[in-house]
Amino acid sequence: MAEPSPSTTVPAKRGFIAAPWHTLSILLFFAYMVFSGANHASAAVSAAGPVSQAALIRGYLLSIFFGFGMAYWCWAGVHWKGGTLRDLTGGRWTNWRSIATDVAVAIPFWVLWEITARLMHRLVNRVPAPTAPYQPPSGLLEVALWILVSVAAGIGEEIIFRGYLQKQFHAATRSLGTAVVLQGLVFGLMHAYQGWKQVMVIAPLGILYGALVAWRGNLRASMIAHAWSDLFEGWLKFL
């Protein structure tokens, strides 16, 4: 895999990129989401029936709002400390070659991600814990919204967890490896609404994303891989 180009990657700043109180506000909100999500998963398992289109669309819209809304809040915290969006993303594409490089990195990474996901699913399926049923999108409106959900996850969640939290955890612990693991655990817990089995699957996948970002020094390849993985796992593989 190619090394990141110095001209398109912004060196990570040392120290906190946002005030500790700002990070605490995010973690407290996430704690609320974890507990409410776990209750939602229990209710979904108990219902054990098809989800109405209205409920499905509402869930998609909330996911889109969460992805972009929380990414904006992360940017606001960095901005208040004098930083820019580049401090979160690590830089943007400047030419077609840099785009091709990141796509070339994202493709084999996604293969590794997919293998890891399948192995984790096999392991957790042995654990006797309920899992919320999944209903793939159907029809033009649901599919269009799911594409937006995938884009929001690829951009928003990478900014939130790898662009923001990973840097904050790194500043707090002085250990990049610890930061990668911590943000992955938080990332997994944020999917408690899907059931605890999914948390056990998604946390290692979040750690993989974090390792990719730590290696590349930017979010570009992870954004591509994340958006594609959500698009594939949530819709395309059911076609």
What are the roles of these predicted feature ranges?
Residues 163-173, 235-238:
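Membrane-interfacial alpha-helical segments at the cytosolic side of multi-pass membrane proteins
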Residues 19-25, 55-63, 98-102, 142-146, ...:
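Residue-level signature of transmembrane alpha-helical entry/exit and packing/kink sites
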Residues 31, 36-40, 177-190, 194-239:
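Functionally important transmembrane alpha-helices
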Residues 1-96, 118, 122-123, 234-239:
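N-terminal, membrane-interfacial amphipathic/helix-forming hydrophobic leader that caps
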Residues 154-162:
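Acidic (Asp/Glu-rich) catalytic motifs at the cytosolic membrane interface
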Residues 95-99, 139-143, 172-178, 195-196, ...:
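Membrane-helix interface segments
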Residues 45-60, 83-153, 171:
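Juxtamembrane helix-loop-helix connectors linking adjacent transmembrane helices
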Residues 34-35, 66-70, 105, 109-113, ...:
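Alpha-helical transmembrane segments of multipass membrane proteins
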